């Protein structure tokens, strides 16, 4: 496909599949590879071809369409970002200039990377009747009248992988949150010796029995090189099994996120590891949340916002910006990432009074 979304294809099929109010709501979801002709591709962030998930729905009323799009945004995307990716974001709506083409409202989740730039992690769109009108998506109501549907769409892509790398990674490589990690614990033999390898297998069996996703590295190649390889891959916990500690029934457990080490009895590794994995998950989220708060500056005007955007995010009254202010921000490659209520909640639309905006440089 040449289009970054399947809206045109799905719109045509919705018009064929929907005949009656009994066919509503129609809820469609797909995973597919899409192509977008990027002039300056960036790995994981803006690649010419990428895997993404997109959903499209049709409803009998605006309220139903809006409620479903909002539910996806808060209960699916935001839940996944916070509780799996350990990625705090600012939830809000896009200003008119940044909305998805044809949408009457676009919800977004904006994350901050370690360099202070914003990354749009996921979006959900209220399309009103605009797409239904363009593709003749009608249904017959209970009263026998032909009525236009209300539609929504929402999507996320492998851009989240880029967000994961830039949000949590460090100079040693990836740092993967435990709930996401395909391998949560790697058990490494310090030396390739039968007794050590047997102990590694025993530790792995205990971890598997405790529901931990585990991999064993049986000591082929230098120990230092293998440790470095697993650090690059971001495995949350490393259990080192060496002949010296093994004589006393001990192993060393190392956290990837902090590098903290603890020596444990071999038989106590499984319960301790399970506890540590949950601790790491929480610590990674809270650490990222603290960095986001620390790098978000409340400012009074656009010049201050531009200055703050050199190192992080700026928050200011939306009334101070408007279309003219957006143009002024863009001169310095700063954009309005989202609009929020003053308490940080997501507004229904951009006409609400007393809104604030989050501005930043972005990927």
How should each PLM-predicted stretch be described?
Residues 1-363:
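NTP/phosphate- and nucleic-acid-binding module
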């Amino acid at each position: 496909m040449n289009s970054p979304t399947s809206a045109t294809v799905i719109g045509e099929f919705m018009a064929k599949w929907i005949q009656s109010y009994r066919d509503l709501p129609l809820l469609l979801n797909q995973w597919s590879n899409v192509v977008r002709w990027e002039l300056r591709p960036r790995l994981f962030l803006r690649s010419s071809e990428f895997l993404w998930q997109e959903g499209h729905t049709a409803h009998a009323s605006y309220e139903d369409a809006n409620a479903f799009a909002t539910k996806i945004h808060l209960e699916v995307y935001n839940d996944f970002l916070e509780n799996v990716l350990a990625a705090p974001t600012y939830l809000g709506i896009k200003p008119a200039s940044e909305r998805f083409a044809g949408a009457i409202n676009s919800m977004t989740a904006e994350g901050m990377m370690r360099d202070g730039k914003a990354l749009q992690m996921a979006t959900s769109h209220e399309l009103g009747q605009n797409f239904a009108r363009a593709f003749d998506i009608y249904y017959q109501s209970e009263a026998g009248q032909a009525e236009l549907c209300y539609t929504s769409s929402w999507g996320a892509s492998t851009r989240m992988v880029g967000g994961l790398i830039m949000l949590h990674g460090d100079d040693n490589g990836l740092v993967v949150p435990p709930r996401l990690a395909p391998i949560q614990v790697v058990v490494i033999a310090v030396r390739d010796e039968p007794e050590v390898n047997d102990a590694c297998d025993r530790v792995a069996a205990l971890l598997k029995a405790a529901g931990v996703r585990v991999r064993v590295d049986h000591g082929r190649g230098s120990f230092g090189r293998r440790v470095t390889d697993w650090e690059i891959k971001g495995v949350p916990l490393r259990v080192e099994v060496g002949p010296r500690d093994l004589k006393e029934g001990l192993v060393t457990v190392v956290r990837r996120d902090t590098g903290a080490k603890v020596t444990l009895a071999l038989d106590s590794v499984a319960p301790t590891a399970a506890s540590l994995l949950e601790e790491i998950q929480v610590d990674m989220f809270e650490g990222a949340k603290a960095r986001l708060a620390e790098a978000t500056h409340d400012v009074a005007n656009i010049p201050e916002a531009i200055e703050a955007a050199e190192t992080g995010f700026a928050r200011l009254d939306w009334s101070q910006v408007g279309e003219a202010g957006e143009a002024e921000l863009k001169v310095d490659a700063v954009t309005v990432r989202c609009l929020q209520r003053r308490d940080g909640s997501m507004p229904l639309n951009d006409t609400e009074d007393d809104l604030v905006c989050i501005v930043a440089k972005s990927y």
